[in-house]
Design a protein with these regions (language model features):
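N-terminal Rossmann-like or analogous alpha/beta NTP/dinucleotide-binding catalytic cores
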Residues: 1-103
């Protein structure tokens, strides 16, 4: 593993306001990145399209910034990567490495 590429991430779900648990996780990730010279990334877990909101995501990011918990680079939205995930699933399925789950 390339030590220089290790990153720390915070991945909230934009389905409601940040709460104490979210903020604790964000603070721990930010402190871990800062204390080790790593980068903090933010990835929005917005695949729950029914409950996710761009307005809430924006509010969450504003709250983090207001608290001084800054990240590096653009925020990654999982929904923007859906096509990549579909390609990976298709490759795994074609190679016989996927089985249906009926749970």
């Amino acid at each position: 593993m390339n030590e220089g590429r290790i990153r720390v991430r915070f991945a909230p779900s934009p389905t409601g306001e940040l709460h104490v648990g979210n903020l604790r996780t964000a603070l721990v990730a930010w402190l871990a990145a800062r204390s080790t010279g790593r980068q903090l990334l933010v990835r929005m877990e917005d695949l729950d399209r029914h409950n996710s909101s761009a307005t809430i995501a924006s509010c969450q990011l504003s709250d983090l910034a207001a608290l001084g918990l800054h990240w590096v680079g653009e925020v990654v939205f999982q929904s923007d990567r859906f096509d990549l995930y579909r390609q990976a699933i298709d490759q795994l399925t074609a190679s016989g490495r996927v089985y249906p789950c009926f749970c």
